[in-house]
């Protein structure tokens, strides 16, 4: 058995020992957005450290646990914090969670993150619906022997982010009076924030927001046939676009400021998808 797939099956067995809850939709909460998990009707929680072989998050604002429960009547699993490539994990560990959720039975995945705005029309506190991504700065999680149990060798990526789900997000944001941007997300490795020159590069490539997660997870999820939606919270302007130095505290403060809108939007989307 492929060693990566063997690790996945070990983690899945560990989760099944702890709960038989089967979610319809999975949600990944990015930096500063983790409090949403406290708003749902919680059935059970599992800390990442209690899952055999599972990577654990080391970043402030990422609690590091699965929260199983209901958004109204919709069964969901929320990943309260994620692991990042810059934490030193192999890319196959970084995408282990979305793969695990696919193996668990869920077919819809909502990815959220905190991101820096590249588009000068964006402001801190805006939400950006991800229409596509650029992830050439990080290794593909599909490199190596293909895991046939997960998906085909050469998966199509012409619609990584579901058009159907994007239309739902736009409709719900409009009804809630939430200003929603749409654009291309660029994933860089981190943990350092991007340089002004890197920001110019990302803008030339067509990027609207930049961060250190999400694209690799979306790629792995699409390989498995999951329907994916991505939403960025623009927590700061990227380096060189303002006079302020970048810091993680600003990310948390901006996320706190828009927490109510974030809760309303994600809840409405989960009900509809």
Placement of each model-derived feature along the sequence:
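Non-catalytic positions within long, well-ordered alpha-helices that form the structural scaffold/packing
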Residues: 101-105, 203, 222
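Polyanion-binding loop/helix "lid" in catalytic or ligand-binding cores
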Residues: 150-161, 173, 187, 199, ...
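His/Asp/Glu-rich mid-to-C-terminal helical/loop segments that flank catalytic regions of hydrolases
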Residues: 239-273
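Short acidic/polar active-site loop segments enriched in Thr and Asp
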Residues: 107-108, 208, 227
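Active-site/ligand-binding-proximal alpha/beta "capping" segment
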Residues: 166, 172-208, 266, 273
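Zn-dependent metallopeptidase/amidohydrolase metal-coordination segment
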Residues: 212-250
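Metabolite-binding pocket within alpha/beta catalytic cores that recognizes anionic/polar moieties
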Residues: 1-157
